[in-house]
Amino acid sequence: FVLKKNELTLKWERKASAGGLVTAVAPVVIQGNGIWIGWAGVHLEEGEKIPESDPNDKTPTAGLLSDRVIPVDFDPQIFDSYYNGCCNGTFWPLFHSMPDRAQFSADSWKSYCAVNKEFASKTVGALENLSRVDTDSGTPLV
């Protein structure tokens, strides 16, 4: 899901986002009482919470409880360079046997490294917090 501001209430609301990976992974996270670490699609201020899903939401991420979601925040330009530059411009063609379509950019690579460093930091922090509150917290799947 991504977050969108409701124009009437000015509160964040969850909106479904497309993606096969999310569709496949979300039910596993939910059934395993896991933690979802991801980009919410917007910048959240310190202390702003992820809202619960709408009770009528039937999308795969609807069952992710807000206290099990860890948002990762990025500068929009860095995220765009990471996602559209490195992931879609470089990795996607390479992983789909189209190396002639791959585009290589040092800036996109730097953005990719910065985004992954932030994801790693949030993941380690979440695992450390989980180990403090639940000594039998299982095995992390990344």
Predicted regions and their residues:
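Catalytic cores of carbohydrate-active enzymes across secretory and cytosolic contexts
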Residues: 1-142
